[in-house]
Amino acid sequence: MGEETDRWQRHDWWGVVLDTDDVETLTRFYAALRGWRVHHLDETDGSLDPGEGVAYLNIQHNREYVRPAWPTQSGEQQMMLHLDFEATDLYSEVVRAVDLGAELCEHQPQENVRVLLDPSGHPFCLYVS
């Protein structure tokens, strides 16, 4: 097996980009929720480094951002994606997420999953496997 290349020197990074009208709030929310380092933050975008692998989460300012509806409603802004995060203790992770600024959704389609909305209204899930 060959020598591994430092993750910062690799050219196979990939990421997810979330639009928002409040870059700082959303960047700091996900940094606190996941314990990820804020790699970059200004008024136009924020970038989070999870610390291993080659994936990242980027938060991008969009002046025309509209919060998606959850659950989905005809004629309303649809969610484009949602993030899933595994939890060790679902109850305590939900409480922590709400304390950080998330909103627990009334509609919960699965027993071992909790759907929440981040401060910009993007649905995300906490789950136990």
Label every model-predicted segment.
Residues Q110, Y127-S129:
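Residue-level structural signal for beta-strand termini and adjacent loop
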Residues R7-H61, E93-V95, D99, C105-V115:
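Core segments of cupin and vicinal oxygen chelate
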